[in-house]
Amino acid sequence: MYWSLTKYTLFISLIILSFSCAPQEKDEGQTYIVCTTGMIKDAVENIVGDKVKVDALMGPGVDPHLYKATQGDLKKLQQADIIVYNGLFLEGKMGDVLQKLDHKKMVIAMAELLPKKAFINNTEFQGAFDPHIWFDVNLWKKAVQLLSKELIKNDSLNQSFYNQNANKFSAQLDSLHKAVQSQINLIPEDKKVLVTAHDAFAYFGRAYVVDVRGLQGISTLSEFGLRDVSNLVDFIVQNEIPAIYTETSVSEKAINAVLEGCKSKGHDVVIGGSLYSDAMGEEGTFEGTYIGMVHSNVEKIVSGLSKNTKEK
């Protein structure tokens, strides 16, 4: 433990030192925003349009819980005028690093702009909250609106432009929220159970009335044992759940263990698809947008859980 804490302290010190010593290399007059995740980048881009250059540190398939900054990432953070991250410990120790930079530049924890009453408690860590707020589309819309107000503080000349964009995106999210509700209602009530590798979908479950079960905890750093697998297998078999799901940013090993356990008990459950949980799809694709990511997930969830297990 001592060695890990020592390395962590050194890591923070080196990053902060690099911000103090290294020269800035960016286009003069152009605001540069660096985001941690693709979901946040998507939100920022929908607000600022082409007025600002926006980058994300974590691309498709990257698990923010396990993320480690590269030299290239540190350079981006150094050059950024504004840094936007999720907060609520989604980025792990990196969040602590970013907080220490707020006296040098504007640093925004997007999720933490919301009131605490909006959060789901993290049962693994006392006093902490579940960071996966983007799976409640309506809650994400509220976070986007609050983020827009923060960005306007840095660029009041474009206030009208930002407000217009935020309102347009909010309307799209309202439509998305209603579409998700409508699609989820197609699933038989007794099959509205979403089983995934880690517990990233609690906000989705709360918003759309779905029972959510994850083999790992809220963070992929959480470990699981044979008893966890056995208990989840028993639940799936007893409730005749037709499909379970892998995640694009999490190893399939855990869910494959559950799959084999179910089959060993005579329940032919299937992998309903790979869901976008902590990262979006490839840039330039529909799934590489927040709206596309949600649509893709819901399509797979509805398709998999609507199957009649007795017809298999």
Model regions and ranges:
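Bacterial N-terminal signal peptides that target proteins for export
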Residues: M1-T9
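Bacterial N-terminal signal peptides
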Residues: T9-S18
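Extracytoplasmic metal-acquisition and chelation regions
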Residues: C21-K312
